């Protein structure tokens, strides 16, 4: 039996020229999740991270607070889908993140505003009608993540490793949970919108089957500082 901890990266730099880097708050979130692992894990886990900068930074900062010597196994299969490309196919302003950020700052409810764009963009992507317009189709992304998860489980069996921590993104974590629970695409992305930065979703791999133990844990962030709860 093995336990897999799926960690969403800390807050990235929304609206900046380079989204793929942690904000100052994101760096703090990563350190807090590292403190949590130091308190709860008795032995160094297998550590895996996507190759995106926000994944690597979150992993490095978390390990600096917990298991300093644990190597990070980098695997691009755990990377998020290209959200800027997917969203810009629906809303061209996503090609100019600084303009989108200005728009968001002007609305009364930024989360609802972005949620509407998110829902429309995802509906278009998962509908398959426009697959030829995307770098990676929804089915391609889903298959990539499910394969990465299965490969990890097989590796845990082969090495008899009891614990693994994977630093990734909300879309990836949603697909993994969807695989375990048998969810369809719309349900999967409903989960995605609720996952907080630096949260932990826990799976158990036992007897060739995956079980969901917890989803979107973030109590350690709230206990440290309620201002650390972010979704964007």
What are these regions (language model features)?
Residues 2, 68, 79-109, 139, ...:
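Acidic, low-complexity terminal tails and accessory targeting/binding regions
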Residues 4, 45, 162-168:
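Generic beta-sheet signal
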Residues 10, 170-171, 216-219:
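Active-site metal-binding loops of divalent metal-dependent hydrolases
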Residues 34-116:
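Phosphate-coordination/substrate-recognition cap region in phosphate-metabolizing enzymes
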Residues 133-155:
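Active-site periphery "cap/insert" segments of enzyme catalytic domains
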């Amino acid at each position: 039996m093995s336990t897999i901890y799926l960690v969403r990266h800390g807050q990235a730099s929304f609206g900046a020229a380079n989204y793929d880097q942690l904000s100052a708050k994101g760096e703090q979130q990563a350190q807090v999740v590292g403190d949590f692992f130091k308190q709860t894990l008795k032995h160094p886990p297998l550590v895996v991270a996507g190759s995106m900068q926000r994944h690597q930074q979150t992993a490095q900062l978390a390990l600096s607070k917990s298991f300093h010597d644990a190597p990070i196994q980098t695997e691009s299969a755990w990377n998020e889908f290209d959200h800027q490309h997917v969203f810009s196919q629906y809303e061209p302003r996503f090609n100019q993140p600084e303009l989108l950020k200005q728009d968001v700052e002007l609305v009364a409810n930024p989360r609802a505003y972005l949620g509407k764009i998110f829902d429309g963009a995802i509906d278009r992507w998962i509908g398959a009608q426009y697959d030829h317009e995307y770098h990676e189709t929804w089915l391609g992304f889903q298959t990539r993540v499910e394969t990465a998860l299965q490969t990890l489980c097989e590796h845990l069996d082969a090495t008899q490793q009891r614990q693994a921590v994977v630093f990734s993104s909300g879309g990836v974590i949603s697909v993994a949970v969807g695989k375990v629970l048998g969810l369809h695409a719309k349900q999967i992305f409903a989960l995605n919108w609720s996952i907080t930065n630096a949260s932990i979703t826990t799976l158990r791999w036992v007897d060739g089957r995956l079980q969901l133990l917890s989803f979107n844990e973030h109590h350690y962030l709230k206990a440290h500082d309620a201002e650390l709860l972010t979704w964007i």
